[in-house]
Amino acid sequence: MKVVVSIGGSVLAPDLDADRVADYADAIQSLDAQGHTLGTVVGGGPTARDYIGSARDLGANEIELDQLGIAVTRLNGRLLIAALDDRAAPTPAESYDEGREAIRRGDIPVLGGIVAAQTTDAVAAAFAEYVGADLLVYATSVPGVYNADPNEDDDATRFDELGADELVDVIADIEMDAGSSAPVDLLAAKIIQRSGIRTMVLDGTDPERVVRAVEDGEFDGSEILPEA
């Protein structure tokens, strides 16, 4: 099975912990050893937010802030590449073409951000569509998709399953509420809707959950199903 795994920066590198990165590399290598074709996308997490906040205070514009965030995602990507050793492409892919070429060579590509004004959520969805992935997995700090931001609304309820059309509606509603955040952004949701790729959103703080989700289809989170 061809699988793209999106690893949130808050999951992979909330701080510099080599053991956490090594555990994620072990999970990716385990899936690779089972014969799956893999691509990975890594987010920026709190480090990116810290840099962006400081740069904003210094007067950087939004495109400059995006470029700074992209640079941090690629630093996180290099940590994962170091842990994956010779199974990974040697540097983070800076385009979808580079990522696909790595897969064709038999390497595991690691992508961070690609272009300004696009999150790594959207990069993962677009890359999954580009390479014809069978499954897209978002390993996040939130255990699934909720009907509201669970950090803002104590009554938020999680979807075990939802269609891609419903995902777009839910994310659009959440993003309209100031201060709220969703496990994937609206552009990513729309790409998932367009592509028809089966998608899982799960709590990725334990990388073994990603392995079980891919191998057994067993996970505690939300599954987004293609529309008929």
Swiss-Prot record:
Keywords from the named record: ATP-binding, Cytoplasm, Kinase, Nucleotide-binding, Pyrimidine biosynthesis, Transferase
Claim: Aminoacyl-tRNA synthetase is one of the keywords in the record: no
Assembly mode: Homohexamer.
Gene3D superfamilies with a match to the protein in the record: Acetylglutamate kinase-like (3.40.1160.10)
Protein name (Swiss-Prot/TrEMBL): Uridylate kinase
Gene: pyrH
Residues binding ATP: G9, S10, G45, R49, T140, Y146, D149
E.C. code: 2.7.4.22
Disulfide-bonded cysteines: none
Enzymatic reactions: UMP + ATP = UDP + ADP
Domain of life per record: Archaea
GO biological process, one term: UDP biosynthetic process
Activity regulation note: Inhibited by UTP.
Pathway: Pyrimidine metabolism; CTP biosynthesis via de novo pathway; UDP from UMP (UMPK route): step 1/1
Function, as annotated: Catalyzes the reversible phosphorylation of UMP to UDP.
Molecular functions (GO terms): ATP binding; UMP kinase activity
Chief subcellular location: cytoplasm
